[in-house]
């Protein structure tokens, strides 16, 4: 058994009769690419590596593992996103939620940014340009995360593809600041 599987077993034994669900955050490296592991049937426990500077990335892994604890599996090629798929966008009539914008979904095009409000994710002030070394490919979670380094700079968190990084330039999939006409 791997160190992650042994730790998960021991944690599951500890909490077996004490809680409905438990998630253990650890600073220990979980076997290279493993950022989290959870049982889908045995005991409702998860083990999550606190691996990043951003609590949002760690929270995302924890939510993923909690989904496994609740019996959810990964979507596969056969899933065409009916209601049972995790990637399915819920209809406004199917959920209870606060007020939303537009057609109820955030659908920003590459390079789009919002300023604030309930439709904003990773909010930035309008017209803000990030430093070229902050380009970050959201699809590369778990690799070298780039964040602002100076305490004088605002914290932009992750900077996704298409974010303006200089005049006429945007972040591309190689985390480089390139001419907007050659980025895609």
Swiss-Prot record:
Ca(2+) 2 binds at residues 100, 103, 105, 107. The active site is at 65. Its main location: secreted. Zn(2+) binds at residues 64, 68, 74. GO terms for cellular component: extracellular region; plasma membrane. Its EC number is 3.4.24.-. The N-terminus is blocked. Ca(2+) 1 binds at residues 20, 88. The keyword Isomerase does not apply. InterPro entries: ADAM_Cys-rich (IPR006586), MetalloPept_cat_dom_sf (IPR024079), Peptidase_M12B (IPR001590). Residues 1-90 form the Peptidase M12B domain. Gene3D superfamilies: Collagenase (Catalytic Domain). Keywords: Calcium, Disulfide bond, Fibrinogenolytic toxin, Glycoprotein, Hemorrhagic toxin, Hemostasis impairing toxin, Hydrolase, Metal-binding, Metalloprotease, Protease, Secreted, Toxin, Zinc. It comes from the Eukaryota. Residues 98-124 form the Disintegrin domain. One of its GO terms (biological process) is proteolysis. Expressed by the venom gland. Pfam families: Reprolysin. GO terms for molecular function: metal ion binding; metalloendopeptidase activity; toxin activity. Disulfide bonds join 114-120, 165-177. Its cofactor is Zn(2+). Belongs to the venom metalloproteinase (M12B) family. P-III subfamily. P-IIIc sub-subfamily. The hemorrhagic activity of the whole venom is completely neutralized by an antiserum against this metalloproteinase. Snake venom zinc metalloprotease that has fibrinogenolytic and hemorrhagic activities in mouse and rats. Hydrolyzes the Aalpha-chain (FGA) and more slowly the Bbeta-chain of fibrinogen (FGB), without affecting the gamma-chain. Its hemorrhagic activity results of its involvement in cleavage of basal membrane components (nidogen and fibronectin but not laminin) and depletion of fibrinogen, prothrombin (F2) and factor X (F10) in blood circulation. This is Zinc metalloproteinase-disintegrin-like ammodytagin. It comes from Vipera ammodytes ammodytes (Western sand viper).
